[in-house]
Amino acid sequence: MRLRKKPWARPALEACSFFVINPTEYKGKWREVFGNSNEIWLELGCGKGGFISKLASTNPDKNFIAVDIKDEVLALAMKKIENEYALIGAETKNIRLMAHEIMLIHRMLDENDQIGRIFINFCNPWPKNRHKARRLTHPNQLNQYRTFLAPNGQIWFKTDDTMLFQDSIKYFEQCNFNIVYLTEDLHASGFEGNIETEHERMFLEQGCKIKFLIAEKK
């Protein structure tokens, strides 16, 4: 569903202490942004922020970068993050939110950033053959991620789409990743540590099984 234009979104984001206006300026320097050497985790397509707000607020020993493209959705994520941290009385020191085109993620990250973990949750499946190169798990993208993933860095991937999941398994293998965990029914698998996204709850209510894998950089 398309979000309505929110004129207040960009001014609110620019006034936010954890929003990064020009992320490409910090390519290779993200540890300096956070002011420590803690491992950095990255969510590509953070949406309304339900996932990243819980993950970041409960892992203060990690740093988090959350990326999406639309100001309207990022403004909702900003509010979700602020509320989640307020609930536990914590400061938003370990998270940064930004607008950036994910297909061009290499413009804001490089090998000096050593990302420990990437999360891709319920991305657009792009089912038509002519659009498949736009998938966030397509080899074109995976090869970008490899450049800034740390040794043994991981990609955690969730989807409700069977075709995308099956194709993505091939993509990961093709791009020299080890698949270290895989299930076609996450919520029946006994896997611990899952944080549900807004889309995930919706798909579960519809009776969909959630597919999930962890791929590790060789």
UniProtKB/Swiss-Prot annotation:
Transmembrane domains' residue ranges: none
This enzyme's EC code(s): 2.1.1.33
InterPro entries: Lipocalin_CS (IPR022272), SAM-dependent_MTases_sf (IPR029063), tRNA_(Gua-N-7)_MeTrfase_Trmb (IPR003358), tRNA_methyltr_TrmB_bact (IPR055361)
UniProt keyword annotations, A-Z: Methyltransferase, S-adenosyl-L-methionine, Transferase, tRNA processing
SUPFAM superfamilies: S-adenosyl-L-methionine-dependent methyltransferases
PANTHER family per UniProt: 3-DEOXY-D-MANNO-OCTULOSONIC-ACID TRANSFERASE/TRNA GUANINE-N 7 - -METHYLTRANSFERASE (PTHR23417), PENTACOTRIPEPTIDE-REPEAT REGION OF PRORP DOMAIN-CONTAINING PROTEIN (PTHR23417:SF14)
Family note: Belongs to the class I-like SAM-binding methyltransferase superfamily. TrmB family.
UniProt-recorded name of the protein: tRNA (guanine-N(7)-)-methyltransferase
Organism: Acetivibrio thermocellus (strain ATCC 27405 / DSM 1237 / JCM 9322 / NBRC 103400 / NCIMB 10682 / NRRL B-4536 / VPI 7372)
